[in-house]
Amino acid sequence: MIRWALPVLLFPYHAGACGLGLIFAIDVSLSVNDAEYELQMGGLSRALQDRSVLATLEQIEGGVSLALIQWSGQLDQEVSHPWRHVASRSDLSAFAHDIARTKRAFATETAPGSVIDLASQYHDQNPHACQRTVTDVSGDGVQNTGPRTRLSSAMAAGRGQTINGLVILGDDPDPEDFYRHNVIAGPDSFLEVATGFEDFQRAMRDKLLRELPSIVAQN
């Protein structure tokens, strides 16, 4: 079932501006075992605390808003970490430490279209009006249930949102082509490739260092 970690607002409420609203959509489907889940969460936590990522964040006017959704089957998504405004190294470190302690929510089918739909709506619940809105979908497999991923991505892109991908290689069929042609969409969207779960931290760091400077350049 879809679980929200805080009440859903009936209309957007914006408390202030920010440079980037970024949702991490983390795959916890059945193809991801518990050790691989830990590599994802630990890798994301460490990537957020990377010295270069922290230095780039400090240059973003208004800071960033971050959230994390775990996703699996069509009705299996959880907003595990609601929107949090991050404007300093200590803010980002606190968010990263919370991610490292996140308990796994699901282990069912693979419905990337469903999490893209949820994330698109959840951007509206961000209490800060962000200059750019991005959803990062990471995963190791192709869709096997839920709405058509390409359509969900196109609808989110039509709202001005960007959907980036971080694909983890190693499954059969190869998910890279699926992510490249069905997941990524919107302004300046791109795909980052991890050669396996052990490479997730490096790929996440590189993805962040590609996303964040584009916001700095627009400030």
Identify the meaning behind each predicted range.
Residues 12-14:
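N-terminal signal peptide c-region/cleavage motif recognized by signal peptidases
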Residues 168, 173-218:
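Von Willebrand factor A/integrin I-like adhesion domains
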Residues 18-82, 93-138, 164-175, 199, ...:
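Von Willebrand factor
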Residues 141-182:
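VWA/integrin I-like adhesion module and closely mimicked acidic/polar interface patches used
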Residues 25-35, 66, 82, 98-109, ...:
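Second-shell loop/turn segments in exported
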Residues 51-60, 108-109, 127, 131-133, ...:
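Surface-exposed patches in mature extracellular/periplasmic domains of secreted proteins
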Residues 63-98, 175-182:
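Short beta-strand-loop
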